UniProtKB/Swiss-Prot annotation:
InterPro entries: AAA+_ATPase, ABC_transporter-like_ATP-bd, ABC_transporter-like_CS, ABC_transpr_MalK-like, ABC_transpr_MalK/UgpC-like, Mo/tungstate-bd_C_term_dom, NA-bd_OB-fold, OB_MalK-like. GO terms for molecular function: ABC-type transporter activity; ATP binding; ATP hydrolysis activity. The gene is msmK. Keywords: ATP-binding, Cell membrane, Membrane, Nucleotide-binding, Sugar transport, Transport. This is Multiple sugar-binding transport ATP-binding protein MsmK.
Length: 377
């Protein structure tokens, strides 16, 4: 059983006036697949490196299986890492690359052979064991890098953007490979990415991080915005940042006020809210106050039947760009000065400049405080 506890971890670099990572607090369960996701500079890789022992922890405690390991060397933490750049030895065969770490730890020849061949079978590399890295595709090289970690049989696997060097098609297949490998070996895993699709498809839980400029503007501070399952983050974002980061295309946002049971914006949006939403917002003190209304592209419909059923939730907007994606069409539209997106039926393709009527499924909308950007519930 392997659990990790990151107890209020802080990181400040020498000669810096601010923390690069601030109050990172997380408990990771045995065999859990955790993904750190966020924009560049949010501290996700720095946090991973602190777990690995490659960066010192300025403040806070890191525990592995209940033992504080802040001062333990990386080699003594029983952690295996997979990096973005593969880090393979070009003059060695696949077999020798995978066996190298075990040889350094003085494993017997028989034990090395058994572990390498087992890992190769899991990763589909058996027929490539005698080849050199130059003779492999990008995806095969990444599997070798993963194999080198798997043979270690480490307590914890750390993966730092392992798919970012691969093309889009290969990333999709490798995501499936990583998920399959995790199910098979069941190791506690921390995975870092800037790609929210990777996070949503791989994670048991996601840690969303943000970066904000420090007061003197000399750097950024990385903070945790929300931790939860992919479904929790998608359906119940804690704030506007999380709502806008998770989902592709991103959630649409409108600056609105509530007037006579309707959401009203300066750009011409006027749609009725549900009775339950109205009561909730008024009970929270948002009657006649500015707030932010968020709605996902898939919750906006161009169906005539829906428009006839919900006329008080329908608006007219101008098409800016229309993308036919085969099974669906993405409409990028403008309402006054506000741009937004709608995911509609493939047949609803429109030329730029056309006016279209769209119905908002307000019941699936989200509300955020205009000042704090925190979710209103």
């Amino acid at each position: 059983m392997v659990e990790l506890n990151l107890n209020h971890i802080y990181k400040k670099y020498p000669n810096s006036s601010h923390y690069s990572v601030e109050d990172f607090d997380l408990d990771i369960k045995n065999k859990e697949f955790i993904v750190f996701v966020g924009p560049s500079g949010c501290g996700k890789s720095t946090t991973l490196r602190m777990v690995a022992g490659l960066e010192d922890i300025t403040k806070g405690e890191l525990k592995i299986d209940g033992e504080v390991v802040n001062d333990k060397a990386p080699k003594d933490r029983d952690i295996a890492m997979v990096f973005q750049n593969y880090a393979l030895y070009p003059h060695m065969s696949v077999y020798d690359n995978m066996a190298f770490g075990l040889k350094l730890r003085h494993y017997s020849k028989e034990a090395i052979d058994k572990r390498v061949k087992e890992a190769a079978q899991i990763l589909g590399l058996t027929e490539f064991l005698e080849r050199k890295p130059a003779d492999l595709s990008g995806g095969q090289r990444q599997r070798v890098a993963m194999g080198r970690a798997i043979v270690r049989d480490a307590k914890v696997f750390l993966m730092d953007e392992p798919l970012s060097n691969l093309d889009a098609k290969l990333r999709v297949s490798m995501r499936a490979e990583i998920a399959k490998i995790h199910r098979r070996i069941g190791a506690t895993t921390i995975y870092v990415t800037h790609d929210q699709t990777e996070a949503m498809t791989l994670a048991d839980r996601i840690v969303i991080m943000s970066s904000t400029k420090n007061e003197d503007g000399s750097g950024t501070i990385g903070r945790v915005e929300q931790v939860g399952t992919p479904q929790e983050l998608y359906n119940r974002p804690a704030n506007k940042f999380v709502a806008g980061f998770i989902g592709s295309p991103a959630m649409n946002f409108f600056d609105v006020t509530i007037k006579d049971g309707h959401l009203v914006s300066k750009d011409g949006l006027t749609i009725a809210v549900t009775e339950g939403q109205l009561k909730m917002l008024e009970s929270k003190g948002f009657k006649n106050k500015n707030l932010i209304f968020g709605i996902r592209p898939e919750d906006i419909s161009s169906s005539l039947l829906v428009q006839e059923t919900y006329p008080d939730a329908t608006v007219d907007a101008e098409v800016v760009v229309s993308e036919l994606l085969g099974s669906e069409t993405m409409l990028y539209l403008k309402l006054g000065q506000t741009e937004f997106a709608a995911r509609v039926d493939a047949r609803d393709f429109h030329e730029p400049g056309e006016k279209v009527s769209l119905t908002f499924n307000v019941a699936k909308g989200h509300f955020f405080d205009a000042e704090t950007e925190a979710a209103i519930r």
